[in-house]
A protein has these predicted regions:
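Amphipathic terminal alpha-helices
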Residues: 297-305, 309-331
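NAD(P)H-binding glycine-rich loop region in Rossmannoid oxidoreductase-like domains
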Residues: 47-90, 98, 118
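N-terminal Rossmann NAD(P)H-binding glycine-rich loop of SDR-like oxidoreductase domains
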Residues: 4-24
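Conserved C-terminal active-site "lid" loop/helix of NAD(P)H-dependent oxidoreductases
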Residues: 204, 241, 264-309
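Conserved Rossmann-fold NAD(P)-dependent oxidoreductase catalytic core, especially the SDR/UDP-sugar
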Residues: 94-138
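Catalytic helix-loop patch of NAD(P)-dependent Rossmann-fold dehydrogenases
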Residues: 90, 121-168, 189
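Substrate-positioning beta->alpha
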Residues: 145-146, 174-179, 193-215, 223-227
Length: 331
């Protein structure tokens, strides 16, 4: 079995990836910035190491590692360009350099299909991408720039793959499903475009298993990217209905035109920017766009080259999340 470094192991995706790899028998170094959250992995065989990828020496992390799985990122619909650049580009550049110096064989980078986002319906998006003249979010731009860093390292001899998972959810999720629940706290949920947008989501366990397969995948690891999802596009109204039912919540669904929702989000953003600390508003234009416009991915490349076969359905994934939430959050 291999010695592996998993960055971002104190986060949602990273903790699942580290736990799965450790359970599979690999020697895992689990890195994160928050010791309390890293302790979620204490029941596993993973070695827990606190370090900041932007400031600390990284050689102790990558030393003797066969592969690095880079899950660390600042992932949010709200934030400054500087913070996204630091958390997603600088951190990636530094861990790539440390990996190359340590002789790491393979580098797996967690990218994002948010780079494709437009205020327009898009179906069957493949991995080809041309950056826009103007980015809609600083987050998406930073994720693309981090991919360019990976490609550069691959051109210099490091085996590297990029995974672009769409809307990852599951146990310990702190972003996708909790945000939907928070919006519904008032007893009603705004269904942008009547919830008719068709989207892709990814259960975190399916992603974790794919990462394990990537470690030994017989592919040209030249920094190429792979779309990842559950491969089962679903309408937003169906998704939230399944979520609220699993959580035992009665929520009134209120259809709202896309234009009205975007305007409401714009007002919420302007209010947030003048408040102390510039807190994230409940509605953002990007968030409205994600729920109001269809975006589905073509995952045939991952199926063909990485033998990706998502085993856990959206319905089962939501049920697993609901059970975890009831046991650990709402107990």
């Amino acid at each position: 079995m291999a010695r592996l470094l998993v960055t971002g192991a104190s986060g949602f995706i990273g903790s699942h990836v580290a736990g799965h790899l450790a359970a599979s028998g690999h020697q895992v170094v689990a890195n994160g910035r928050c010791l309390d959250r890293l302790r979620l992995l204490q029941g596993t065989a993973a070695q827990l190491v606190v370090a900041d990828l932007c400031t600390d020496a990284l050689e102790p992390l990558t030393e003797a590692c066969d592969a690095v799985v880079h899950c660390a990122a600042l992932s949010s619909p709200w934030g400054t360009a500087e913070s996204f650049s630091r958390g997603n580009v600088l951190a990636t550049r530094r861990i790539l350099a440390a990996s190359q110096r340590a002789g790491v064989r393979r580098f797996i980078h967690m990218g994002s299909p948010s780079i494709h986002f437009r205020f327009a319906d898009q179906y069957g998006i493949d991995e080809r991408f041309e950056p826009p003249r103007r980015w809609i979010t600083d987050y998406a731009r930073s994720k693309w720039e981090s991919e360019l860093c990976v490609r550069s390292a691959a051109a210099n001899g490091l085996e590297a793959l990029v995974l672009r998972p769409r809307a990852v959810f599951g146990e310990r999720d702190q972003a996708i499903l909790p945000r939907l629940m928070a919006i519904a706290d008032r007893g009603w949920f705004p269904l942008v475009h009547s919830g008719e947008a068709v989207i892709d989501v990814t259960y975190v366990g399916n992603l974790s298993r794919l990462v394990a397969q990537c470690l030994e995948a017989d592919v040209v690891a030249d920094g190429r990217a792979y779309n990842v999802s559950n491969g089962d596009p679903i309408r937003v109204v169906e998704l939230v209905t399944k979520l609220f039912a699993a959580m035992g919540r009665e929520v009134r669904l209120v259809p709202i035109p896309r234009g009205v929702a975007v305007a409401m989000a714009g007002i919420a953003e302007r209010i947030a920017r003048v408040r102390p600390g510039c807190p994230e508003p409940r509605l953002t234009r990007y968030g409205v766009g994600v729920l109001g416009y269809s975006q589905t991915l073509d995952i045939s490349l991952a199926r063909r080259e990485l033998n990706y076969a998502p085993a856990v359905s959206i319905e089962e994934g939501i049920e697993r999340y609901a059970q975890w939430w009831k046991q650990h959050v709402h107990a």
